[in-house]
């Protein structure tokens, strides 16, 4: 039994450091969500003249995962200088599998072009943002703000596999030739 679920946690704390009691604070929040989906689908394609060359029905199962992390560390020095670090991480992943049966012209055979198509797909994306920010009070009326960041995006989308199996006298058989596909 697949049950949708979600978890999250957050917290923070402030400490005072040294004889000047300079505040150091941090905050963290994290979350994880998993959602499942099930759909009945119909796939139909025609030529420009209206001839149906694909007419399939099937079921698709999908799992969607989302993860989030946010963090902050902040330090004040003598109420004049300020340094902070921020981190954000977002991850999103989806995987699905669908089985479709019916007519497809790729199944050229004696069984009225009937067969089974299995389509599997994975999408995996990650974003990471790092920031370092500072504020320096040089005088009562002059300050310096500076910042730097390093960010990273990784996308593995899509990783897709399509397998076609044609109807045969004793069940199904794997098609020959270029009918199996893999995209990455």
Question: Where on the chain are the PLM-derived regions?
Answer:
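Transmembrane beta-barrel wall of Gram-negative outer-membrane proteins
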Residues: 1-99, 125-130
